[in-house]
From Swiss-Prot:
Organism field: Kosmotoga olearia (strain ATCC BAA-1733 / DSM 21960 / TBF 19.5.1)
Gene from which this protein is expressed: argC
GO molecular function, one term: NADP+ binding
Enzyme class: oxidoreductase
Subcellular location: Cytoplasm
Record's keyword terms, sorted: Amino-acid biosynthesis, Arginine biosynthesis, Cytoplasm, NADP, Oxidoreductase
Catalytic reactions on record: N-acetyl-L-glutamate 5-semialdehyde + phosphate + NADP(+) = N-acetyl-L-glutamyl 5-phosphate + NADPH + H(+)
Record pathway: Amino-acid biosynthesis; L-arginine biosynthesis; N(2)-acetyl-L-ornithine from L-glutamate: step 3/4
The protein's name: N-acetyl-gamma-glutamyl-phosphate reductase
Length: 339
């Protein structure tokens, strides 16, 4: 059995890790940590949880002794500091600390420094793109939720060199759980119910992450226009991406079918079939569709994921499975909750 620790177990992504790993056939949870609830049992904090383990303070020596892999679900800068103290343990960070090739970009967007950061020691954890590198990685930077939805939708065209990198417009809509558990009037029921709003327009922290990975896929430095929105639902992301390509709609469809044909979690829909976030609720699945606006010669890509599963904790477990040579869908072969 793989001994697993979760640091930050009482946030939304931490709880989702507990939910998934509790039912994983090859895992034993040996350490749970929470800064806010240290000393309490998890099911005292959340009575619906089936785990009665005590939430502990972070103890690097104890974690190193009792864990083979640790998931960190912590604020920017904190995961990196803790990870450096852990010995002979593999790390999957659900924050941003291990996502960037250039620490200066991270510092610019997150206003944090990562002392002695070595980008060659970590792997960006979008499983479908980097599984071969993930296999032997010690540090994996789990992708952000928006980047996951956008990169999955654009990777085949970018890698094929069939996308005009000069014009990429991304419109994404997310459930409010993507903002985490922090208290804010902006995320209250009275502000969100029956409403839709854009936020962090042109300055969302996921922009440099998307640009980094998209540039690597196409081999050219590119920039995109990204506008995220909050919608009055708990889970789910729907991204609509507008791009230019010389390929016909049928050619794009065949390219995507071939690219993702062997993937267990990525589903390419026929043109004219458009996905709903409800199709992914509580699951690690992603659906991608496409349309062509012949009048403006624009290709429209649409992707949906559950932001807490494929966009966070589910993908983290998928990465763990790859790192430990398990079946990639181990612990993740559950269907979406519908309706």
């Amino acid at each position: 059995m793989i001994r697993v620790g979760i640091i930050g177990a009482t946030g939304y992504t931490g709880l989702e890790l507990v939910r998934i790993l509790t039912n994983h056939p090859d895992v034993k949870i040996t350490f749970l940590s929470s800064r806010s609830f240290a000393g309490k049992k998890l099911n005292d904090v959340y009575p619906f949880s089936l785990k009665n383990e005590t939430l502990e303070e972070i103890d690097p020596e104890k974690i190193s002794k009792n864990c083979d892999v640790v998931f960190t679900a912590l604020p920017a800068g904190v995961s990196y500091e803790i990870a450096r103290k852990l010995k002979d343990v593999r790390i999957i960070d659900l924050g941003a600390d291990f996502r960037f090739d250039d620490p200066a970009v991270y510092e610019e967007w997150y206003s944090k420094k990562l002392p002695d950061y070595d980008p060659t020691e970590r792997v960006y954890g979008l499983t479908e793109l980097y599984r071969e590198k993930i296999k032997n990685a010690r540090f994996v930077g789990n992708p952000g939720c928006y980047p996951t939805s956008v990169l999955l939708a654009t990777a085949p065209l970018l890698k094929n060199g069939s996308l005009d990198e000069e014009t990429i417009i991304v419109d994404s809509k997310s459930g409010v759980s993507g903002a985490g558990k922090k208290e804010s009037i902006d995320y209250s029921f009275s502000e969100l119910s029956g409403s839709l709003k854009a936020y962090n327009v042109s300055k969302h922290r996921h922009v440099p992450e998307m640009e980094q990975e998209m540039s690597k896929l196409c081999g050219k430095r590119l920039k995109l226009v990204f506008t995220p929105h909050l919608v009055p639902m708990v889970r789910g992301i729907l991204s609509t991406i507008y791009v230019k390509t010389d390929l016909s709609l049928d050619e794009v469809y065949e390219l995507y079918r071939e690219y993702y044909g062997k993937e267990k979690f990525i589903h390419v829909l026929q043109p004219g079939v458009y996905p709903s976030t409800k199709w992914t609720y509580g699951s690690n699945h992603a659906f991608i569709s496409m349309a062509k606006d012949d009048r403006t010669d624009t290709l429209i890509l649409i992707s949906v994921i559950d932001n807490l599963v494929k966009g966070a904790s589910g993908q983290a477990v998928q990465n763990m499975n790859v790192m430990f040579s398990l079946a990639e869908d181990a612990g993740l072969s559950f269907n979406p909750i519908y309706p």
